[in-house]
Structure formats: structure tokens, C-alpha cells
């Protein structure tokens, strides 16, 4: 780059003082353009070089596992205790269920049993607020929330779960995967609030697994499980395992058909695959894996 700058200096500066006003203007504009291009090229080279030289992580999963996997489900849908949890229990797989107290109260005894059996109960707010661009969320739109209102709601949800199930939630899932409150210049992220109140916060419809040596536990990526075949999910698993990452799958209904439904056939195939020691997968609930990461990464 120094050579290029020197060349420009030789070509233009020596004649600059003899140029008319228009020529000087065009020359300056040309030099600005060249410097901009060279700067962008230099940055690109540095970025690529940095990517190539990233140090290898010394993070390792327990018992020589090559990746971690968590199955998570939202909203305390009725199909979860009716059909999904018995299937998970059949294979000894522990999942995380992010519940809203209103839905949970329809099957309190079943949710108590699930918690006692090692499934994690997480916080998913009281009202399930999302952007008001969803008409069903207009009366509880995130655009109308304040941080104080959100903090009160999340605390209320945790208190209700504690009162009804005897569980202190340490994991949270952002409703609709949205992490903002307010509008325009008054928009605020409530990720710091979640980081203060919980061990982890899970997103929704993300495109990558989580690097245990780097990920922000308050903003965990989660890939959709709803509507997926085992073959489709297996590709996500293979990607995560190649990097030693943590794949979080997120779903809603646990049934054989319907909208926002994680297929029982897919879940069963996942369980069988994940518990096979040859596949090198640590499958566990979000809390257990997040806690391990928090205590073991440098």
C-alpha cells in the first residue's frame, strides 16, 4: 500500500500546482476514490488474515463428547406433557420447556412430574409479548413496553413458576425471539435485563449453533425444530459436531401434524441418535450445558 501511495504522489503532486481549478478538483476526487479503494482492500486482507489465524479453542466437552445438543419447547402446549415428554422419558432425554404460567396451569401436576423427572422449566414471560406487527400481540406489543415493565413481568413469571412448581427458573426464552422494547430512538434491548436475571437467554429462528468458547449466554442461538425431518436436523447436527459447538433446537407442539409442530417421529429419531455413544453427543437441558460452559471456558 505504501508503494501505491508513493506512486500516486509522483504522478499527481508534481504537476498539481500547474493544474487549473477544475483539474485540481478532479484530481483530488480521484485520489480520494483511490485511497478509499486501497483502504477497503487493506481491511479486507486483514480481515481474511485474521480469520485464517484464529487460535484454536481449548474448550472441551465432558467425557470426550464432540458437541452438545439441547431440545427446547415453548409455551407449555398441551401436547408437550401429553405426548412429547413421555417420548423423551422413554429414552432418558432431558429437555428444557420454556413456559408461560397461564398455559402451565392447565396441567400443573404433569409439569410438576416433568420437573421432578429432570426436565428443565424455563421462563417465557407472563404475556408472551412480541412486536405489535403481529395483530394478536397488539395489546401486548413490545413497542409499548419499558424496561421496568419487562422486568416486573419476568419476575412475576418466575415467582408464579416457583409458587406452582417449586422451581426457580434460570433459563429464559425471548418470545418470538425478539429482544427489544420501545420505538425509534427510544428502542432498547432487554438482553442486559435477561443477563442480570437469568443464567441464559435463548433466541429463535437463528442460523448457527453456539460456539461454547465465545457465545453470549444471554443471547443463545436456537434453530427451528418444528416441521423438520430427522434428515434435515441431522445436517445441523453434523455442522455443529464438526466445530465442537452447541446446537439448540426449538419447537412448540410435539405431535404428528399441525402448525408449529415438532414431529414425534423426528424427536424419537433424534433421541435414538443422540444417546448412541458412537455419535459423540452430549444431549441435556439448557441449564446443565450453560452451567458447564460458564464454569469451564476461559
Feature locations, PLM:
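A generic structural signal for short coil/turn motifs at secondary-structure boundaries
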Residues: 40, 180-182, 256-261
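Bacterial Sec-dependent N-terminal signal peptides
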Residues: 3-46
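Catalytic domains of cell-wall/extracellular-matrix polysaccharide-remodeling enzymes
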Residues: 83, 105-106, 133-233, 266
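C-terminal domain-boundary segment and adjacent tail
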Residues: 47, 54-63, 103-106, 198-213, ...
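Residue-level preference for the first positions of well-ordered beta-strands
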Residues: 69, 246-248
Amino acid at each position: 500500500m505504501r508503494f501505491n501511495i508513493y506512486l500516486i504522489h509522483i504522478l499527481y503532486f508534481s504537476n498539481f500546482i500547474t493544474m487549473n481549478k477544475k483539474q485540481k478538483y478532479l484530481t483530488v476526487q480521484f485520489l480520494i476514490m483511490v485511497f478509499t479503494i486501497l483502504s477497503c482492500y487493506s481491511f479486507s486482507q486483514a480481515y481474511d488474515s485474521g480469520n485464517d489465524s484464529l487460535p484454536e479453542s481449548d474448550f472441551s466437552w465432558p467425557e470426550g463428547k464432540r458437541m452438545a445438543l439441547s431440545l427446547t419447547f415453548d409455551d407449555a402446549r398441551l401436547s408437550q406433557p401429553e405426548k412429547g415428554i413421555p417420548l423423551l422419558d422413554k429414552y432418558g432425554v432431558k429437555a428444557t420447556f420454556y413456559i408461560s404460567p397461564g398455559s402451565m396451569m392447565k396441567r400443573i401436576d404433569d409439569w410438576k412430574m416433568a420437573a421432578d423427572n429432570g426436565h428443565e422449566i424455563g421462563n417465557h414471560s407472563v404475556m408472551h409479548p412480541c412486536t405489535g406487527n403481529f395483530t394478536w400481540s397488539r395489546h401486548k406489543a413490545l413497542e409499548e413496553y419499558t424496561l421496568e415493565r419487562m422486568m416486573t413481568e419476568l419476575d412475576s413469571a418466575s415467582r408464579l413458576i416457583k409458587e406452582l412448581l417449586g422451581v426457580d427458573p434460570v433459563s429464559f426464552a425471548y418470545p418470538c425471539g425478539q429482544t427489544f422494547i420501545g420505538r425509534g430512538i427510544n428502542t432498547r434491548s432487554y438482553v442486559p435485563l435477561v443477563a442480570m436475571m437469568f443464567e441464559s437467554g435463548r433466541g429463535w429462528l437463528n442460523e448457527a449453533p453456539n460456539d461454547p468458547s465465545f457465545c453470549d449466554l444471554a443471547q443463545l442461538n436456537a434453530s427451528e425444530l418444528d416441521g423438520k425431518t430427522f434428515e434435515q436436523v441431522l445436517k445441523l447436527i453434523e455442522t455443529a459436531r464438526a466445530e465442537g459447538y452447541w446446537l439448540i433446537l426449538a419447537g412448540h407442539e410435539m405431535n404428528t401434524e399441525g402448525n408449529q409442530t415438532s414431529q414425534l417421529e423426528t424427536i424419537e429419531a433424534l433421541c435414538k441418535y443422540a444417546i448412541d455413544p458412537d455419535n459423540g453427543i452430549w444431549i441435556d437441558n439448557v441449564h446443565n450445558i450453560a452451567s458447564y460452559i460458564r464454569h469451564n471456558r476461559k
